[in-house]
C-alpha cells in the first residue's frame, strides 16, 4: 500500500504505526570522515551555511532513528523540524529544496512520493537490518541503486 501513498499520506499512516516491519531505532549511523570534501555537502554549506547542514543531518537522523530508509515529507514533518531548530517553515522548506538540488536527497522520489531518501540513507538502513539480523524491506518504487 505504501507504494501508492505520497509523503503526507505516509505521515498520517506512520504516525500511529509501530516498528513492525522496520529495523527498529538505530543508536548510531555512519558519517564519512570525508563528508566535508563531498561537493554536495560543500554546495549546501556554501548556500545555507551551518544551519543548512544541521537541518540536513537532522532529517537523515530522523529517518534512520525511526528505523526506516526514508522520511515522509509533509507539513507536519516540516513544522516539527522548524520547531526543533527554532527557525521558520520557509527556511526549512528552502533548505530541503536545496538538499534536493545538490543531490543529497533524491529529487525524483521527492517529487513523486514526497519522501526524503538517498543512497546513503538506504545503505545505512541495510546495514542496520544486517546488524539486527532482520530482512530489509525497501519497496521497489523507493529503492535506489545501493552498492
Go through each PLM region and give its residues:
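Short amphipathic alpha-helical segments
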Residues: 38, 53-57
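Generic alpha-helical structural element
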Residues: 33, 44-48, 117
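Single conserved hydrophobic/aromatic residue that forms the stacking wall/gate
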Residues: 1-14
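Short, amphipathic alpha-helical interaction segments positioned at domain boundaries
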Residues: 119-147
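Minor-groove-contacting beta-hairpin "wing" of winged helix-turn-helix DNA-binding domains
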Residues: 112-119
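Long, low-complexity, charged/polar intrinsically disordered regions in eukaryotic proteins
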Residues: 13, 17-39
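Short clusters of hydrophobic/aromatic residues that line enzyme substrate/ligand-binding pockets
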Residues: 31, 71, 116
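Winged helix-turn-helix DNA-binding recognition segment
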Residues: 43-50, 58, 63-111
Amino acid at each position: 500500500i505504501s507504494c501508492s501513498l505520497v509523503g503526507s499520506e505516509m505521515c498520517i499512516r506512520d504516525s500511529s504505526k509501530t516498528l513492525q516491519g522496520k529495523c527498529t531505532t538505530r543508536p548510531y549511523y555512519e558519517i564519512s570522515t570525508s563528508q566535508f570534501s563531498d561537493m554536495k555537502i560543500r554546495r549546501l554549506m556554501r548556500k545555507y551555511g551551518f544551519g543548512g547542514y544541521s537541518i540536513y543531518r537532522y532529517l537523515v537522523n530522523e529517518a534512520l532513528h525511526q528505523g526506516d530508509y526514508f522520511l515522509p515529507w509533509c507539513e507536519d514533518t516540516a513544522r516539527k523540524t522548524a520547531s526543533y531548530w527554532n527557525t521558520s517553515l520557509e527556511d526549512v522548506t528552502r533548505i530541503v529544496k536545496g538538499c534536493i538540488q545538490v543531490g543529497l536527497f533524491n529529487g525524483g522520489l521527492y517529487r513523486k512520493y514526497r519522501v526524503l531518501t538517498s543512497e546513503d540513507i538506504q545503505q545505512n538502513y541495510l546495514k542496520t537490518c544486517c546488524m539486527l539480523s532482520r530482512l530489509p524491506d525497501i519497496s521497489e518504487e523507493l529503492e535506489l541503486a545501493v552498492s
